[in-house]
C-alpha cells in the first residue's frame, strides 16, 4: 500500500528530473527514458502519473508558471496598500525572481516558447501566462493613467520584461537583476511622470 503523500512527492521528483534533463539536452531530446533515469524510476512510473512525455512537459511548465505566479503574488501581498509605482515594480521583481532566471528555468522557458508554437496544450499555457502579466500591469498602471494609456504602458513594460529576460537567456552571462531593474524602473517612471506632467 503506497504511503500517504507519496504521489505528490513522486510527481515533484519527476518534474524536477524533467527540468534537469531539459537543461542538459533540450526539450526535443528529453526522452522518457532519460527523465526516468534521472529520477531513478522506471519508465512505467512516468506513464502512470503523466500518461506520456507531453503530459510530463505540461506539468513541468505548470510548475514553473506556479513559481512565477507565487513570486509575484507574495510581493504584491506585502504591498497591498502601496502606490501603483511600487506594485508595478513588484510585478517586475517577481518576473525576475531567481526561480525564473536560473539557468535551468531559462532553458526550460526557451524550449517551452519554441514548442508552444506547435503544441496546442503548451500554447494555451503560454497565452495564460501572457494574459496574466498584461492584466496585472494594466490594472496597476490603470490606477494612475487613463485606460488607453495604461494599456499601452502595460504592453510596453511586458515587452521590456520579456526582452530583457530573452537577451539574458541567449547570452553567456548571468542575468543582471540590477541592470534589468534600472531599465524597467526608468520606463515605469517615464510612463507615470509623463502623466503627472500633463496634469500639472
Swiss-Prot record:
This protein's name: HTH-type transcriptional regulator BetI
- Positions of the DNA-binding region: 31-50
Gene from which this protein is expressed:
betI
Q: What does this protein do?
A: Repressor involved in the biosynthesis of the osmoprotectant glycine betaine. It represses transcription of the choline transporter BetT and the genes of BetAB involved in the synthesis of glycine betaine.
Q: Where is the HTH tetR-type domain?
A: 8-68
Record PROSITE patterns: HTH_TETR_1 (PS01081), HTH_TETR_2 (PS50977)
Q: Looking at the keywords, is Cytoplasm present?
A: no
What are the record keywords, sorted?
DNA-binding, Repressor, Transcription, Transcription regulation
- Write one Gene Ontology MF term: transcription cis-regulatory region binding
One Gene Ontology biological process = glycine betaine biosynthetic process from choline
This protein's pathway reads: Amine and polyamine biosynthesis; betaine biosynthesis via choline pathway [regulation]
Q: Does the keyword Repressor apply?
A: yes
Amino acid at each position: 500500500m503506497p504511503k500517504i503523500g507519496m504521489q505528490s512527492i513522486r510527481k515533484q521528483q519527476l518534474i524536477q528530473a524533467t527540468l534537469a534533463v531539459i537543461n542538459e539536452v533540450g526539450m526535443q531530446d528529453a526522452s522518457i527514458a532519460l527523465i526516468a533515469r534521472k529520477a531513478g524510476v522506471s519508465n512505467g512510473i512516468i506513464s502512470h502519473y503523466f500518461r506520456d512525455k507531453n503530459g510530463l512537459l505540461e506539468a513541468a511548465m505548470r510548475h514553473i508558471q506556479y513559481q512565477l505566479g507565487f513570486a509575484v503574488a507574495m510581493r504584491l501581498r506585502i504591498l497591498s496598500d502601496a502606490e501603483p509605482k511600487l506594485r508595478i515594480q513588484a510585478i517586475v521583481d517577481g518576473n525576475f525572481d531567481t526561480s525564473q532566471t536560473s539557468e535551468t528555468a531559462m532553458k526550460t522557458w526557451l524550449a517551452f516558447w519554441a514548442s508552444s508554437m506547435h503544441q496546442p496544450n503548451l500554447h494555451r499555457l503560454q497565452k495564460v501566462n501572457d494574459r496574466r502579466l498584461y492584466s496585472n500591469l494594466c490594472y496597476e498602471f490603470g490606477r494612475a493613467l487613463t485606460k488607453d494609456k495604461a494599456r499601452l504602458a502595460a504592453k510596453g513594460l511586458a515587452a521590456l520584461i520579456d526582452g530583457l529576460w530573452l537577451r539574458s537567456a541567449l547570452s553567456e552571462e548571468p542575468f543582471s537583476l540590477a541592470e534589468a531593474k534600472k531599465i524597467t524602473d526608468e520606463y515605469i517612471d517615464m510612463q507615470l511622470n509623463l502623466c503627472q506632467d500633463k496634469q500639472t
